A protein has these predicted regions:
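Amide-donor transfer/coupling interface in amidating biosynthetic enzymes
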Residues: 2-4, 8-11, 17, 21-22, ...
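Generic hydrophobic secondary-structure packing signal
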Residues: 8, 58, 80, 225-228
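Residue-level signal for inorganic ion chemistry
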Residues: 47, 79, 249
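A short secondary-structure junction motif
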Residues: 49-53, 85, 251-255
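Glycine/serine-rich anion-binding loops at beta->alpha junctions
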Residues: 51, 80, 283-284
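Glycine-rich nucleophile elbow surrounding the catalytic serine of serine-hydrolase chemistry
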Residues: 79, 83-87
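Acidic, glycine/proline-rich low-complexity segments that act as flexible tails and inter-domain linkers
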Residues: 205-284
Length: 284
């Protein structure tokens, strides 16, 4: 079982969906609705600590989880979770050189590290943050395994424990298939969890052509039928459309206004492809 600590962030469920493609045994717990003793009894095979608002020291049980289970259970921290790992081991969190919210930038990877196995040395990834791990005060027990073009820390690992953090968002559509590969690497190669999906290279954008006919309809100011909307969303959710095509479709829909038939067609696919979430505690 994989335990996903929710730091009250909508990206938690993007992470859940990304992990759910690989394994169905996931439990989500809010950072103030679970205890260390309860986690001990659950005996998870891996722990993922989600993004969230604010500073990691204010993220409920997150840092205590890292201090208690690092070295015993594989841990992956994303964004705030990544910062929590650094702070838990004595690092400092500082303001980034620029705020990035919903921006895609180049990330330089140490591909010798198992978290980035099979990836190119530079990828494009989604960033949503105004804080970063301070490189000057980084504890010696942690090493940097990714940076951005300003030499800011984008990923870390513990030198002796299977504990990893990424500042960027592997679960975001802006990161795409490489993000899924990072999550798969963590589960397969680091946590030793047998997943249900085998690693595969991303479909080249040149072969992602199915969405184009629906994109043309909307860009011409016309509306999709319910069936057309269903097929378009199925293409998107099956990872057969490029990020540029998806962005163009969403922009065109926004400009002309979505119809009831379009919303109904989209919703049908989402319901069919949704994953059920095991949540410990309350759900707002």
């Amino acid at each position: 079982m994989i335990l996903l600590i929710d730091n009250y962030d909508s990206f938690t469920y993007n992470l859940y969906q990304a992990v759910g493609v690989l394994t169905k045994d996931i439990t989500v717990a809010r950072n103030d609705e679970i205890t260390i003793d309860e986690i001990e009894k659950m005996s998870p095979a891996a722990i993922i600590i989600s993004p969230g608002p604010g500073y990691p020291k204010d993220a409920g049980i997150s840092e205590e989880v890292i201090k208690t289970f690092s070295g015993r259970i594989p841990i992956l921290g994303v964004c705030l979770g990544h910062q929590a790992i650094a702070e838990a081991f004595g690092g400092k969190i500082v303001h980034a050189k620029q705020q990035l919210h919903g921006k895609q930038t180049d990330i330089n990877l140490n591909t010798a590290n198992p978290l980035f196995s099979g990836l190119k040395s530079t990828i494009k990834a989604a960033r949503y943050h105004s804080l970063v791990v301070d490189s000057i005060s980084l504890p010696t027990c942690l090493s940097v395994i990714a940076t951005d073009d300003k030499a800011q820390i984008m990923a870390i690992r513990h030198r002796e424990h299977p504990t990893y953090g990424v500042q960027f968002h592997p679960e975001s559509v802006l990161t795409g298939e490489v993000g899924n590969m990072i999550i798969e690497n963590f589960l397969n190669d680091i946590a030793g969890i047998k997943t249900t999906k085998t690693k595969s290279a991303a479909l080249p954008d040149s072969e992602r052509v199915e969405l184009k006919k629906y994109l043309k309809i909307v860009c011409d100011g016309k509306s999709l039928t319910e069936d057309e909307a269903y097929k378009a969303m199925d293409i998107i959710m099956s990872d057969r459309a490029s990020n540029a095509q998806i962005a163009c479709l969403l922009t065109a829909l926004r400009m002309k206004g979505e119809t009831i038939d379009e919303i109904t067609g989209f919703a049908k696919v989402m319901r069919e492809k949704m994953s059920k979430v095991n949540v410990k505690g309350t759900l707002d």
